[in-house]
Amino acid sequence: KALEKTTMVAGEEVVPEKEAKDEKTVANGYFKDADVKDRELSDYTGEWQSVYPLLKDGILDEVFDYKAKLNKDMTAAEYKDYYTTGYKTDIDTINIKDNTIDFVVNGEHHQYTYKYVGYKILNYEKGNRGVRFNFETDDAGAGRFKYIQFSDHGIAPSKAEHFHIFFGGESQEKLYNEMHNWPTFYPASLSEHEIAQEMMAH
């Protein structure tokens, strides 16, 4: 019920919010190269939950309905398909502390120590850009978690409110090509409805 209320209230503000999404802001991917700064793993410190289970359980259907009405570029079903591909992951939670990242998959912990290795600015087809902040571990047993990239719509040091993560065992360069699957994590302290509300405001 609370979620339905939020959707209705937000719906009254469709026009100004649509304008806001078109603004050339940093969050929307418009910035100067000189404004991009290196970031520490501490920007991502905390306990994070995957939003993929929420999508599978139908919790985010209200979000897709809202996006379809707001943007009028895809149907709610098309949005759900797009985000199903984007959010898909077998990682349940990610815990980040100091220089370590602990990936929890089906109750099993995969924890490694990481170092920052720089950032990459990516140009997107629609004219905006994004920044991936790259980390890697020297642990020989890290497998698919050797190379890590964070994207949280920020370009300089600041605490992430949520993030998309890219990972693999081959190279950072290979991960730059991944544009369709971006597992997404929100603070573990947020409820399902709080996450849905954050998404509608995003």
Per-segment meaning from a language model:
Residues F31-E47:
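N-terminal helix-cap/turn-to-beta initiation motif at the start of protein domains
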Residues E40, T75, S191-E192:
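Helix N-cap and loop-to-helix transition residues
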Residues T45, Y52-I59, G86-Y87:
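Sec/Tat-exported extracytoplasmic proteins
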Residues Q49-K56, T100, N106:
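Generic short beta-strand segments
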Residues D61-K115:
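N-terminal glycine/threonine-rich, aromatic-flanked beta-hairpin/loop signature
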